[in-house]
Design a protein with these regions (language model features):
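Structural signature of the Rossmann-like NAD(P)-dependent dehydrogenase/reductase core
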Residues: 5-6, 68, 100-105, 140-146
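Conserved Rossmann-fold NAD(P)-dependent oxidoreductase catalytic core, especially the SDR/UDP-sugar
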Residues: 62-70, 84-120
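NAD(P)H-binding glycine-rich loop region in Rossmannoid oxidoreductase-like domains
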Residues: 47-84, 111
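Residues at the starts of beta-strands that form the adenosine-phosphate
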Residues: 2, 25-27, 100-101, 138
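N-terminal Rossmann-fold cofactor-binding loop
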Residues: 29-33
Length: 165
């Protein structure tokens, strides 16, 4: 099975891939710390902003599963670009009805208080569901607490503890 991990993938480690996707070919977009490993069937690349190049990856690999890690999984994470990346990936999924997509996001959309962040999270969830309905892509949204890491330099807690040293 070929799996694409995209979005806020700085938290993805080789161990996570081995445990979560044994015997799968895994393409990771956006994690600059993870190195490709042919023996373990891991290809790691920076996120591709050029739609033509992203299309070539979708033509090269026949992804059956896509896991998109939202920027909202990082506490005080970067909010720009998420909707565009989601749109690009979902647009390329329309040719393959067998793809299953899991969108991992934060819990902001379930809060009763409306803010800019809750609106953006809700909009991203709506984009995933609408594209899923429009192209008959099996999509699931999983709301989870914030992720944290002692090695991912973009992580809020990593920055906090580094400054405290």
């Amino acid at each position: 099975m070929e799996v694409l991990l995209a979005g806020n993938t700085g938290y993805v480690t080789e161990t996570f891939i081995e445990e979560s996707f044994p015997e799968c070919d895994v393409v990771v977009l956006g994690n600059e710390m993870l190195k490709s490993n042919r023996k373990k069937n891991i290809l790691s690349r920076p996120f591709i902003k050029d739609e033509k190049e992203l299309k070539e990856i979708f033509e090269t690999y026949e992804f059956e599963r896509i896991v998109y890690f939202s920027n909202y999984l990082t506490m005080h994470g970067r909010m720009t670009g998420e909707l565009e990346q989601l749109r690009q990936i979902l647009q390329l999924c329309k040719k393959n009805k067998e793809i299953r997509m899991l969108y991992l996001t934060g819990q902001e959309s379930i809060y009763n208080i409306t803010s800019g962040k809750t609106l953006l999270v809700s909009a991203a969830e709506n984009v995933v569901m609408e594209y899923g309905n429009m192209y008959q892509i099996n999509t699931k949204i999983l709301r989870i607490p914030h992720l944290y890491s002692a090695v991912y330099t973009q992580d809020f807690f990593y920055k906090l503890f580094t400054e405290a040293e």
